[in-house]
Amino acid sequence: MTQVSREARRPVNVTIKTLTAPRFAPPFAALLAMGAYCLGMTMLGSYPFGTRSRAVNDLGNQFVPFHVHLWDLMHGTSTGDLAFNWNSGYGVPFLADFLTYLMNPFSWLVGLFPRELAELPVFLVTLGCIGLGTALMTVFLGRLHPGSAWLRALLAVGYGTCAWVVSDGAADPMWMWGLVSLPLIGIAADWCLHRRRWVAGTLLVGVAWAGNFYTAAMATLAMALVLAVRLLLATDLPVRHRLRALARAATMALTGVLLAAPAVTVTLRASKASRPAPEAVYRGRPPTLDVLAELLPGGRGSVPAPHLFIGMLGLLLVAAFPFVRAIPVRVRVAWYALAACVAVSFVWKPTLLLWHGLAVPNGSPYRASFVLSALLVIISWLALAHRPRPRELAAGAVLVALLAALCHGRSAVGPATWVLVPGCGAVVLAALLVLARHRARRAARIVVAAALTCAVFLGSAYAAFSVTAARDKIEWWGPKITLNERALAAHRGIQQRADWPRSRTDPGPHEFANNDPLLLGGEGGAYYSSYLPEQTARTLRELGGGWYIQGRHTRSLEAPVSRAIMGVSSFQTGPQAGPVDVGRAAAAPLLTVRPGLKADDLDQRRRGAAARGIDVRDDPRVGGGTVFARQERLLGARVYEVPTLRLTGDGGGGSGGGPAAGGHSVSGPGALRGAGPRRRGLPCPALSVALPVPPFPVLSLPDLPFPDPPFPDPPPCPCGRCRAWWTGSGGCRPPAGAGPPSSRSSARPGRTSSGTRPGTTARCGRSAIPPPGSAAGRRPPIRSGGWAGSPPTGG
């Protein structure tokens, strides 16, 4: 028997020393962090470990629908492609959405699961980033300073389950790539310091920026500061070597960003063409104690502040760092100064803008707080790697106790904090004291390893549970139900009625998510994205569609005429969280080409108004600028009829409404044809619209109840004294026989006591009247959104 065969037959003994070898530290840290997060979600009963949905905020409204759409693209069941999305907004570009929301490499796991389980791979995106980021941080800490592999793995778990992850990052899978980008770029910067692997480092930077450029920019800035501190402290290197390393890092970062330029430039151009976000206002620096309270694990404050905690092991070592005498004073000062400067930069507006791409973000203004958590982990590792003495550890423990006492009563300090700080903190302190006194004893090291591992694992799990539970109690963080039985039934129904490309099947009515067309299929008007084109949003609004967030979330058109214009042959209607009804209608051609048609060509009355000098686009009495007129212009034919109104009675009727109260009645037919422009307060007839043959075939829509259309009264005269109506053509026309303003009792502003509109005999003549189109002379905008008014604006 040869020597090789004898070696092959020898049994392999797996020992503690083998398992704690440096090569096993990164996967050990990844498994520990992922296990702690899963345990926390199990305690909460959150999906996929319970029935509680985790689709909160944008996770349910954007990321789950976008991942479902990616599944459709991967399996060839979508009506569009990577360049264009025919499902949302009646057709919008998609490439920028893909490069922003779906470039996380873990997002492609969605193709391995059935469509109805698409929420599971979205959870795996978060879980995978936690594991990979923790493993890479373990490697990066080893490059900062040599030391025990399993100890730095435990500290890396604090980074992977830090407050930013469980509070902010878990709800935005695209941000979770920042957890991976920071140690990736840190490793590349370390190679620059040692003048190695420029090409590999460039690729790491490119991967970080391609995955998510927003958080990668934060990580790049943070690691540039870390590299600057390391170069400043590397006094053993000649100055020319340090300058060369700095130049090497700059060229590496620039080249890596250029590699990701196709993704960055596409999203930048799409952002410029999109609806602007609502202006966010930074409300100033939070109280200092509220910021410091965020260092204590287990709580989530109601005061907006950076989420910072990294677990009790990391916090205790950060507190002990200034007292570790084995570390030179200048090193302690440099690292503490860096952390303090970064913390201050988060609450000072100029530097806050620098961290967030020169714009105050909507929502949390502290999205870069994972950067400070990483710096705290680095400081804790430097303290632990220099083997702090018992007295130094005790000083750190006193500092933590003082911090907890000062922050008592702050919103970020909850019941979980008082479980973790004294309970987990005592175990961690005892383990570190034993390690400091009996480091040479193997049995002591095994006991300390087990105690610290359990403390870190259970503490991280409990912190994730408590913070997520506290966050979900906030009203606008309430979980949504995305892919339940009702949603799957709606998807099957849409697939059965699909008639694309002959006509559209509108999934409406925004029942399950803000991106129902992506979630359920079909071709609707709902679309919620940072890249919603400005022209698309305005066009849909001018046709009567509603929007949220100042146009960053559009809704499907609900009027039959608007649906006909968009070629919708099947649609779903129903109240929120109520039964969903399916409607059908004959659809106009999906695409129609016809010569341009002027607004004055639609009816004789508008031509006459234009001849008299009245702006037919803005005057509501003519209707040229109303939703109804725009629909007629697109159809190229008359659809609505404005009834003739005449005054009856003296306007002194009761308050019960009707002609007696308002002094109005309808002359001519007793019902309105269509649901055209009419005065408020008139009876609302059923809608019956017949579209003429040119340019579409005849379309008969069923009688449907039609809500009050948006047809606002003109504003009163800006002079404020003459009780006249502003005509929009350079003056006001007071009513004949109008008395002084004080003589009015129950009349509406701008009307006579009889409730009539002003006459047309005399002008006010006041020089203070602003010209048409000015802020004071402009009539109120037409409201839309289900015809009854704009939906509430979200944040």
Residue positions per predicted region:
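Periplasmic/ER-lumenal interhelical loops and adjacent helix-loop junctions
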Residues: 61-62, 245-248, 252-334, 341-342, ...
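Contiguous transmembrane helix-bundle modules in multi-pass membrane proteins
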Residues: 337, 341, 359, 365-483
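Membrane-embedded helix bundles of polyisoprenyl
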Residues: 130-144, 150-234, 245-267, 403-404
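Transmembrane signal-anchor helices characteristic of membrane glycosylation enzymes that use polyprenol
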Residues: 23-59, 252-265, 343
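Membrane-interface coil-to-helix junctions
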Residues: 37-137, 157-179, 286-293, 347-351
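Start-transfer (signal-anchor) and selected internal transmembrane alpha helices
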Residues: 1-46, 248, 437
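Membrane-interfacial loop-to-transmembrane alpha-helix junctions, especially the N-terminal start
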Residues: 26-29, 147-154, 190-201, 249, ...
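Soluble catalytic regions of membrane-associated enzymes that act on cell-envelope
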Residues: 455-691, 695, 702, 712, ...
